């Protein structure tokens, strides 16, 4: 069963984060989808499509739409893949957002996912965008507080 929402409840947000963590651990991915509609051009447009099976969230489509060129991310629990859940989510997205002025849809994913699922692009009839984002990271290094004279640490309430 698919439910479309323009905003996630606390429980749905918790379920979504759990599903994202599971998919990331399985796929070796790191980028988390945006789980708010705060920046979407129309706050009434559905931005979250949740696929439940026997009361468990097994699929999620998120929409980031700060303008009419929207980005979607689709996540399906590893144990429920290749069962049409992603397509059902995308079909629901197309139907539910048909009345909104969407100009284009871009699928967001990571290189490692495409390498592990080489048929994904062709199966969906997609064209890879060469203008992809590059995410850089750096390991954190501890900063001894005693040596930072311009820093005051307070406990939050």
What annotation goes with each model-predicted range?
Residues 46-59, 154:
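Conserved beta-hairpin
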Residues 69, 95-112, 120:
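Conserved GNAT acetyl-CoA-binding A-motif
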Residues 1-35, 136, 142-157:
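Short amphipathic alpha-helix that is part of the acyltransferase structural core
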Residues 108-110, 125-141:
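Conserved catalytic-core motifs of GNAT/GCN5-like acyltransferases
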Residues 73-83:
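A short, internal acetyl-CoA/4′-phosphopantetheine-binding micro-motif in the GNAT/acyltransferase core
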Residues 117-122, 126:
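Conserved active-site tyrosine of GNAT-family acetyltransferases
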Residues 82-95:
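Conserved acetyl-CoA-binding loop-helix of GNAT-fold acetyltransferases
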